[in-house]
């Protein structure tokens, strides 16, 4: 069902933060499909921002609105990083309280922080002291045996009391041991109703739902109960879905953007990046799924995969790959 009036809540639709996937090049590509989608960075640790020589916060203003997802649990460091991010032009700071990987746990951030609501509250409070942009939290519905609805409500209430007004809830619990991050995205069952109930019990908070969402119809169903939906792998693997988002979820007067249009709009960006020494493959690897289910999609993927990594590969590789796709 197409909405009858514009909807402009910043987080009504967002693309999830995904490690190694939602790079600045990926976000720039996704922005060609949708002007309203909220895009997230990969998770960036506080240490990487404070100590690393590499600029982990580089992005183009044309990507906005973009949220920076931070990984960390030291309130002072998080506040420092949030301040830097706001100065750099990010529109939201998001704290990762959902990733269950061993590496993340060893750094004392991610899903394990659900068991430390007081610390999460301190982190949120410290960041909000330093920035005027929204500070949000992405979390799960529980961890290990701490998976009762009461536990979830207590966590949300405590973090809200510290000033957090927006939550993104992955509708699965996380197992902190015994499952890989991939398995934690698939094996724990989805419990959308629990997330709906959380929104009913905290109507004054803005809440988005995440986990297993793949179609516009599913998004519209969730939006009957939630303020926003967050989509991860489906948006990356089938980015043509993003071309319908503005019209279907924000403003019915917005045009649908086709994959070919989005790819062609990338040409100036690709040339700019090449001139700065960026390898073609670093940009176009995020574009392989652009024509999923279209005639010529396999040839598009194959040609890019076989040629974009070659020395001296330029825009002509993308143009040639595009010639295999039906107009």
Curated annotation (Swiss-Prot):
Write down the required cofactor(s): FMN
Q: Give the positions the UniProt entry annotates as the active site.
A: 99
Could you state a single Gene Ontology molecular function term?
FMN binding
Which InterPro entries does the record match to this protein? Aldolase_TIM, DUS-like_FMN-bd, DUS_fam, DusA, tRNA_hU_synthase_CS
| Residues engaged in binding FMN | 17-19, 69, 138, 170, 210-212, 232-233
Give the first-level EC class, as a single word: oxidoreductase
Chemical reaction(s) catalysed: 5,6-dihydrouridine(20) in tRNA + NADP(+) = uridine(20) in tRNA + NADPH + H(+); 5,6-dihydrouridine(20) in tRNA + NAD(+) = uridine(20) in tRNA + NADH + H(+); 5,6-dihydrouridine(20a) in tRNA + NADP(+) = uridine(20a) in tRNA + NADPH + H(+); 5,6-dihydrouridine(20a) in tRNA + NAD(+) = uridine(20a) in tRNA + NADH + H(+)
Keywords (A to Z) from UniProt: Flavoprotein, FMN, NADP, Oxidoreductase, RNA-binding, tRNA processing, tRNA-binding
- EC number(s) on file: 1.3.1.-, 1.3.1.91
Q: Which NCBIfam families does its entry note?
A: PRK11815.1, yjbN
Q: What does this protein do?
A: Catalyzes the synthesis of 5,6-dihydrouridine (D), a modified base found in the D-loop of most tRNAs, via the reduction of the C5-C6 double bond in target uridines. Specifically modifies U20 and U20a in tRNAs.
Name it.
tRNA-dihydrouridine(20/20a) synthase
Organism the protein comes from: Pasteurella multocida (strain Pm70)
* High-level lineage: Bacteria, Pseudomonadati, Pseudomonadota, Gammaproteobacteria, Pasteurellales
**Gene from which this protein is expressed:** dusA
